[in-house]
């Protein structure tokens, strides 16, 4: 569990941000974006590195192959302090870790690390074994979250005008990053021409909406699902296209579509980002199927980070509904509270992907030390209901929690 000083600092930070954001939101736009129907859940997030092959002697299995030939590795699972629809409770955090079945005791206060000036953090497990390798490693974090439904007053959002400057902390969400390129000429032209007279001829809400619809109009085919799976159907990594993808060919995976939409919104100079998350299909428990979910957001002054889901918009025929009518999936997103937000980039800062991009990352690993024929990884999520939250509704905080 987190020690008192760490827990109190996080509590004060979140409380001050909530009060400030609520006050600012109430003053500027009383009900432009509201949280409601809070649900509290216990989250158990786990990353597992393991061997799929057994060691045999004389035809008898003697255990699994040590497919990871290393003594040290650091595994980082992302966590978000707050998102548009979710707050993390750090009052009761537990971490556990194992190598080849033997538990390694770690202090949660040392494992949790918060990124500076961001709503992002990680559970960083620094693992060590005296042996020259291992067949299985597991790291696990358990904590509470409170998730809300989010309702956006689209009329109020559409009335917000262009600011002189965007708030501090949003500049990174205007820039180019791996997989998201707002400087791509095709994307820039597509997004800018989506609004009659150009993006500045309409308010930011419509500029963003028109840019996303323009991308969807040219995106003719979806490739694969949200994630790749192991033989046991456990979730291994994010799905990517095996062939040509993107706006130029009008096809791609769920993440590739989300990245193109965010790039388009950034290209018209509106901060936008992908919130990488997981959702559970089915009831509580480990037997439920989990999937990656990619929720996009763009920033509006006096309102905050407005969500949209290109996949839902596409299912609603958004590509053929250009104009100012409401489209489900843009601003008002279905089943948003079912998503556990984990991070704002595909791999935590300072870490590398393992065998797949899968939101979590590792460091201190050389490819030469991994038996790629026998090694694999998976990410697991279990959620358990802990009842309803006490605050039935509240404005969405406008800003990410920063010191």
Task: Spell out what each predicted region is.
Residues 1-9:
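N-terminal secretory signal peptides that target proteins for export/translocation
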Residues 12-25:
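Bacterial N-terminal signal peptides
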Residues 137, 147-253, 368-388, 398-402:
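Secondary-structure boundary elements
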């Amino acid at each position: 569990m987190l020690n008192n000083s760490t827990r109190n600092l996080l509590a004060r930070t979140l409380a001050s941000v909530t009060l400030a954001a609520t006050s600012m939101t109430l003053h500027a736009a009383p009900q432009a974006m509201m949280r409601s129907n809070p649900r509290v859940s216990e989250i158990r997030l786990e990353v597992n590195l393991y061997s799929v092959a057994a060691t045999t002697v004389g035809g008898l299995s003697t255990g699994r192959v040590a497919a990871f030939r290393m003594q040290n590795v650091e595994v980082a699972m992302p966590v978000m302090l707050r998102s548009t629809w979710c707050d993390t409770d750090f009052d009761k955090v537990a971490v556990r870790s194992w190598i080849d079945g033997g538990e390694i005791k770690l202090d949660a206060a040392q494992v949790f690390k918060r990124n500076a000036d961001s709503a992002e953090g990680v559970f960083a497990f620094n693992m060590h074994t005296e042996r020259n390798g291992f067949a299985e490693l597991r790291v696990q974090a358990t904590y509470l979250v409170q998730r809300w439904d989010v309702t956006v007053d689209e009329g109020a959002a559409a009335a917000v005008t262009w600011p002189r400057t965007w708030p501090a902390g949003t500049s990174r969400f205007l820039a180019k990053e791996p997989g998201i390129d707002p400087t791509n000429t095709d994307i820039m032209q597509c997004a800018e021409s989506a609004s009659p007279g150009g993006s500045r001829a309409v308010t930011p809400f419509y500029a963003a909406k028109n840019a996303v619809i323009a991308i969807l109009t040219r995106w003719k085919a979806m490739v694969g699902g949200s994630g790749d799976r192991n033989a046991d159907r456990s979730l291994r990594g994010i799905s990517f296209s095996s062939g040509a993808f993107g706006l130029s060919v009008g096809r791609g995976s769920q993440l590739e579509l989300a990245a193109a939409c965010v790039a388009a919104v950034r290209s018209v100079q509106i901060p936008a980002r992908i919130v990488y998350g997981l959702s559970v299909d089915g009831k509580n428990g480990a037997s439920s199927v989990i999937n990656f979910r990619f929720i996009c957001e763009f920033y509006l002054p006096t309102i905050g980070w407005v969500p949209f889901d290109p996949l839902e918009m596409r299912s609603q025929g958004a590509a053929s509904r250009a104009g100012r009518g409401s489209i489900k999936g843009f601003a008002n997103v279905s089943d948003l509270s079912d998503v556990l937000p984990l991070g704002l980039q595909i791999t935590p800062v300072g870490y590398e992907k393992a065998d797949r991009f899968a939101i979590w990352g590792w460091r201190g690993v050389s490819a030469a030390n991994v038996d790629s024929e026998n090694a694999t990884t998976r990410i697991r999520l279990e959620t358990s209901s802990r009842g309803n939250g006490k605050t039935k509704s509240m404005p969405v905080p406008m800003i990410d929690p920063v010191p």
